[in-house]
Amino acid sequence: MYFKMITSAPWVLYPEIGEDPSKKWIFREPKISDGDGIYSLIADCPPLDMNSSYCNFLQSTHFSKTSILVEHKGDIAGFISGYQKPDEQDVLFIWQVAVSPRFRGNGLAFRMLKELLEREALSEVKSVETTITEDNQASWALFKKLDAMNGNHGQVSTFLDEKAHFKGKHDTEFLYRIPLK
């Protein structure tokens, strides 16, 4: 004895099967309506320092050309905030890199960084700078990868010292400067 079984085609039950992978992630400039979502994302990404939500609204408006957001099916999956240094416009300073725990393991941080650096508005950027605490292994790996892609000419120095600047309330921030090819 056998039973007839009627099932839908796999692409009907699981529409993501036929989904174009390039449409899975949307990389774009942040906008004012993203401010609260960015604030929530940063809160979900310790050890990143929390700023006020007002700061995240400023990042998504005043610094939208030098920041990038990636979304997946309407959810904010990641965000990089950055700015061009006022006295060195050819230097892009990366302030924070955040990827939602739900979306880690997809290479989003590096993809966001590459997408950001490929923008026409940043075509004059010759170096990337960021600060990283000693224990933030994810950030070290990300920026070492960027450095390797650009010839391994990056330099690391102490920027803000735990004792001299933070009076023991925050770990030392190391400045990583990466010249771009």
UniProtKB/Swiss-Prot annotation:
CDD domains, alphabetized: NAT_SF
Biological process, per Gene Ontology: ectoine biosynthetic process
Domain N-acetyltransferase: from-to ranges: 25-181
A Pfam family: Acetyltransf_1
E.C. number(s) listed in UniProt: 2.3.1.178
Membrane-spanning parts: none
PROSITE patterns documented for this protein: GNAT
Superkingdom field: Bacteria
One function term, GO molecular function aspect: diaminobutyrate acetyltransferase activity
Name this polypeptide is given: L-2,4-diaminobutyric acid acetyltransferase
Source organism: Vibrio parahaemolyticus serotype O3:K6 (strain RIMD 2210633)
